[in-house]
Amino acid sequence: MSKLFGKFFKNTSLLALVAAPGVVFAAPSTDPISTFGILGSYNDFKLEGGSESDKDHMPEAGLFYNFGNKLTAESGFIYQAGIEAKYGEKSDNKLKEGQADLNLGWRAALDARNFVDVIVGGGYTWTRYEPDTNGYDMKLTNKSPFAKAALGYNHQFDDMTLRVEAGARHTIDGRAKLKVDGVGSDSVDLKDRTNPYAEVSLLMNQKGDLPVMAGLYYTRTEYKLDDDSYVADNTKLKRDEYGFKVGIAF
């Protein structure tokens, strides 16, 4: 009887040793994922004109959706396409925004858990500001295509992935249109600007039935009229946006 038990334990121990590495080191899926969720941000605005400046701030909330393998791929070609919409209101001043972008890149493995990548891409932003002007229905609309470039780093844990990304978006041929009902409208070109951004994302519960993505981001945007007048040369609007995203991946 003791020989039978001894043989049984010997065989099961050998099986456990063979199977254990697959259990302990099993990597999360590298397939592309869809992520849908909510976002919120706090915006600091600073208008500079000559020797004067004015500051204001506004909160925003919205929705986002993206699809790709930027958070899941280990090495090789990576991509992600996304859209988002935001809305903010303060003291009857309204801010509406939309953005769509596409990221393409290449990722290299440093080791089994650490990866770096280079990303290029482009997109389009639309922003409408509706100030409370006591009687006038006024709309200021900005439309800007952009190109982007960034560096990224992924660290893979057992059941989640941390991503850090930093880069810049360069606006191209932006336009601003001011419309006042009952008065008229006018459009001006915006100068091409290079605006930095950074984001940190964490994809959790990757091996579970309901993975969750959470992240923080920062973006600086500068608007300046493309005109040779004294006013245009000395007037610009700076915006610092601090935000978060939380969503489910599927």
Could you say what each language-model-derived stretch is?
Residues 40-46, 67, 83-89, 108, ...:
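Transmembrane beta-strands of outer-membrane beta-barrel pores
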Residues 36-40, 75, 79-83, 118-122, ...:
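Membrane-embedded beta-strand positions of outer-membrane beta-barrel proteins
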Residues 1-35, 249:
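Cleavable N-terminal export/targeting peptides
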Residues 32-34, 55-61, 77, 94-100, ...:
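Residues that define the transmembrane beta-barrel architecture of outer-membrane proteins
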Residues 177, 187-250:
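Predominantly the C-terminal beta-signal and adjacent terminal strand-loop region
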Residues 24-93, 247:
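Short glycine/proline- and aromatic-enriched beta-strand/turn motifs that initiate or cap beta-hairpins
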Residues 26-33, 68-78, 108-116, 156-164, ...:
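Short loop/turn motifs that connect adjacent beta-strands in outer-membrane beta-barrel proteins
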Residues 46-54, 86-97, 128-140, 173-188, ...:
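Outer-membrane beta-barrel translocator domains and adjoining extracellular loop/strand segments
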